[in-house]
Regions:
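Short amphipathic alpha-helix that is part of the acyltransferase structural core
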Residues: 1-52, 56, 61-65
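Well-ordered, non-membrane alpha-helical segments in soluble/globular domains
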Residues: 43-48, 112-117, 146-153
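Secondary-structure boundary elements
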Residues: 65-69, 120-125
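Glycine-rich, flexible loop segments associated with nucleotide phosphate handling
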Residues: 89-96, 144-154
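Conserved acetyl-CoA-binding loop-helix of GNAT-fold acetyltransferases
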Residues: 101, 107-121
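Conserved GNAT acetyl-CoA-binding A-motif
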Residues: 122-149
């Protein structure tokens, strides 16, 4: 599985971020994980899940970080075996599994930058990328949006 590493410095509001990936297990392990990255599970368990994805042959983790602190990420991997779209074992079908930005770093366009960088490598031309969005992972409470307005935001 071809994985082309990319890195981009991003500046906004006098803050510098690095958007980079796909990261290896060792690269990811050398970074710290923001405690507010809890949309899917507690931060420590989510960090472990990301580390596990890096060990998959097709797994890709891209991060947004400030210094050594991961403040956002996006994951790509083959669909889970329990999902019906995995039944064909199509090597060109990859799932954007998760995207999350810490609450303290939202509205800085980091999610947009993560998507742009991660999908800009030539190898993604050979994939069909799918994603599923479940509203119970959305931050409706802190965004003060209802499901329909949050959907428009997405």
């Amino acid at each position: 599985h071809l994985k082309t590493y990319q890195s981009e410095d991003y500046y906004i509001h006098d803050k510098q971020f690095v958007i980079e990936g796909p990261l290896t297990y060792e690269d990811l392990k050398a970074l710290t994980f923001d405690a507010h990255l809890t949309a899917f599970r507690d931060a420590e368990d989510q960090y472990e899940a990301l580390l596990e994805i890096t060990t998959l042959p097709e797994g890709r983790i891209y991060v947004a970080r400030q210094d050594e602190l991961i403040v956002g990420y996006v994951t790509f991997h083959y669909p889970d075996e329990i999902e019906r779209w995995s039944t064909g074992n199509l090597p060109y079908l990859i799932e954007l599994g998760a995207i999350e930005v810490s609450i303290n770093f939202r509205q800085l366009h980091l999610a947009e930058k993560l998507i742009q960088l991660s999908l800009s490598t030539p190898e993604f031309e050979d994939y069909i990328v799918i994603t599923t969005e479940y509203y119970w992972h959305w931050d409706l409470k802190n965004s003060k949006l209802d499901v329909f307005d949050y959907k428009k935001l997405m």
